């Protein structure tokens, strides 16, 4: 059986702490189409921010059971989603790159859908001037946190660059 990327992401958010710490700040609940997966993700996020550790499947099930805004049938479906999460090894670099691409694709898709609603006049809160900002924010989704210079860590490279002797060509 082939897993969807959403399932792979949820699985690794439950079992892979390094992955959780790297990607969790960039994933939004709206990126998940399936309500069951969205609910599971919300509980993973809540637990990680509250306890600063990985959640277990048992804790997830207990947390879901305590919710009052979902029906018993939805609880059963969410339990099914949770039970499908198994600890399967994945290459970390591939997983990070694929998750970043998925986040960017979902952000762009959702931004386009929101832009269409605004253009059709279905959104009373935003006008057409908001569309470029919405699309720009979606296009800028990236896991790269290396923005600018780190003056303490990059000093050797900068020193070499500043003091590099360039060969000059005479006219």
Question: Where do the model's predicted regions map?
Answer:
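Intrinsically disordered, low-complexity boundary segments flanking structured domains
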Residues: 65-68, 82-85, 136-143, 156-160
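Short, surface-exposed, charged/polar-biased interaction segments
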Residues: 30, 44, 61, 81, ...
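Noncatalytic partner-interaction/assembly domains of nucleic-acid and motor enzyme complexes
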Residues: 1-102
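Interdomain "pre-motor" coupling segment immediately N-terminal to P-loop NTPase/helicase cores
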Residues: 86-152
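The Walker A/P-loop phosphate-binding site
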Residues: 11, 142-171
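Short, flexible helix-adjacent loops and helix caps
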Residues: 49-52, 120, 164
């Amino acid at each position: 059986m082939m897993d969807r990327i959403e399932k792979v992401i949820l699985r690794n958010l439950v079992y892979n702490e390094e992955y959780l710490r790297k990607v969790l700040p960039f994933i939004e609940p709206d990126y998940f189409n399936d309500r069951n997966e969205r609910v599971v993700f919300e509980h993973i996020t809540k637990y990680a921010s509250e306890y600063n550790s990985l959640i277990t499947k048992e804790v997830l099930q207990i947390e879901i059971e305590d919710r009052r805004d979902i029906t018993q049938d939805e609880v059963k479906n969410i339990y099914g989603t949770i039970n499908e999460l198994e600890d399967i090894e994945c290459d970390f670099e591939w997983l990070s790159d694929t998750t970043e691409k998925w986040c960017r694709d979902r952000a762009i898709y959702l931004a386009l859908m929101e832009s269409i609603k605004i253009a059709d006049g279905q959104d009373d809160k935003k006008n057409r001037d908001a569309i470029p900002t919405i699309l720009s924010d979606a296009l800028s989704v990236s896991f790269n946190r290396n923005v600018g210079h780190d003056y303490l860590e990059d000093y050797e490279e900068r020193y070499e660059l500043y003091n590099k002797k360039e060969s000059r060509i005479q006219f």
